[in-house]
Amino acid sequence: MTKKERAAYIDEYLNEKYPETPIPLDHKDPYTLLVAVLLSAQCTDIRVNQITPKLFAKADNPFTMSQLSQEIIADIIRPCGLAPMKSKGIFNLSKILVKEYNGEVPKQLELLEALPGVGHKTASVVMSQAFGVPAFPVDTHIHRLAQRWGLTSGKNVQTTERDLKRLFPEERWNELHLQIIFYGREFCTARACQGLTCELCRTLYPNRKHPKKTKKS
C-alpha cells in the first residue's frame, strides 16, 4: 500500500469500528473541559474523571477557581500527578480568563496557547471538542500509532500532526483523532502490540517481523 492507500484504509476501518466518538473527559462547558485536559497530562482519563467532580464541587468556573488558593487546588488534584505545576496553571489561567475574557474561554487557538499551562495539544483538544473547530491533537500515543501505520516518519508530534492533516480530510480530523485514541487503547497498545499483532498493523504490514520502534527527537 502507498501512504495514501494506508490512510484511506485506516479512515474507513476506524470509522466503521467506532461510529460514535464520545469525549473521554467529563465536562459541562469549555472551561471545565480546558481544566480537565490540562489535568490529563501524564494521567489517565479515568483518573481525571475521578478527580474533577471534587475540584468542580469547589469551583467550576474561572471566577470561583481564581478565589481558591493554589494549595487547595493542588491538594485536590494531587492524584493526577504534577500537582504543583498543574495547580499553578489552573489558578493563573483562571485569573486571566476573568481579567481579560470576562470568564469566557477564547475560541482562537493562539489565544488558548497563550494561557498559562496550555500547550498546543491542550489548545487543539479544546478547539476540537469544545468548539467543534477542525483540529488534529497529537500526543505521544497518536505519534506512536502514526509511525506504526506508516503515516509519518517524523520524530516529533509537530511533524506527525502536519503529516496527518495532509493525509486526512479536514472534516474527519475531530472524530479520527478520538478513533485513533480508542483503537490504540483497546488494540494497539504500547507494549502488547508493538506494531505486530493488532488487526490494523497486521493488515498494513503483513510481512513485518520485528517490533516497530517509535522515532523520537
Regions picked out by a protein language model, each given a short descriptive name:
Residues 2-215:
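Catalytic cores of DNA base-excision repair glycosylases
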